[in-house]
């Protein structure tokens, strides 16, 4: 008679967490950066890693002001996005350059998460973050602003980033290299 052994709780947890593991890709525009977010998602999937995309422009959260802080009737429900970030293995942020900085959709999202999340620091502290931009201009200022923001929040921002613009076309080799850096 063969006895079938039931996996231990730890093994079940490891199997479940590996299957549920994902990279969260945030798109801070509904145009070319959303297309870039989808390219990242597809590339992660080809490497065997699940990816989820959130288009921040569809959140329709009000512009954060201190007057709205704590007003339950006007504050957005950040719990779903907080949960997605908290449970992700890494973040990829795709954002265009707006007037030399990151776009309002990203800045507003971070502002609301900072006041509405149960533990804001837990969302970003020690989290791997990859930055990417598809910008009409160079995109360097947006990347610097995002790097500063996420570093301030305690994230581990990957040194290399992806920049697409009129003089820098998409490179799958660059994307593959960046994905490997996230998966390490």
Language-model regions: role of each:
Residues 28-30, 56, 134-136:
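Cofactor-binding loop segments of dinucleotide-utilizing enzymes, especially the Rossmann-like FAD-
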Residues 73-153:
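Helix-loop-strand module that forms the ligand-binding subsite of alpha/beta enzymes
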Residues 22, 152, 156-184:
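Glycine-rich phosphate/pyrophosphate-binding loop and the adjoining helix
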Residues 47-52, 155:
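A generic structural motif
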Residues 57-73:
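N-terminal beta-loop-helix "entrance" segment that forms/cooperates
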Residues 53-55, 159:
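A structural preference for short, hydrophobic beta-strand core positions in alpha/beta folds
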Residues 20-47:
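N-terminal beta1-alpha1 ligand-phosphate binding loop
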């Amino acid at each position: 008679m063969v006895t079938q052994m039931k996996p231990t709780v730890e093994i079940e947890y490891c199997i479940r967490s590996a299957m549920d593991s994902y990279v969260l890709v945030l798109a801070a525009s509904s145009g070319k950066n959303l297309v870039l977010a989808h390219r990242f998602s597809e590339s992660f999937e080809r490497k065997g890693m699940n990816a989820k995309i959130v288009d921040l422009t569809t959140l329709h959260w009000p512009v954060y002001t201190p007057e709205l802080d704590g007003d339950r009737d006007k504050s957005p429900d950040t719990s779903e996005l907080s949960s997605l970030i908290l449970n992700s293995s890494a973040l990829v942020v795709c954002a265009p350059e707006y007037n030399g900085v990151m776009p309002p959709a990203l800045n507003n999202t971070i502002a609301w998460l900072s006041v509405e999340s149960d533990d804001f620091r837990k969302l970003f502290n020690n989290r791997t973050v990859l930055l990417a931009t598809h910008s009409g201009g160079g995109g360097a200022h947006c990347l610097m602003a995002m790097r500063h923001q996420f570093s301030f929040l305690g994230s581990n921002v990957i040194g290399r980033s992806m920049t697409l613009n009129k003089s820098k076309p998409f490179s799958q080799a660059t994307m593959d290299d960046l994905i490997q850096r996230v998966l390490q």
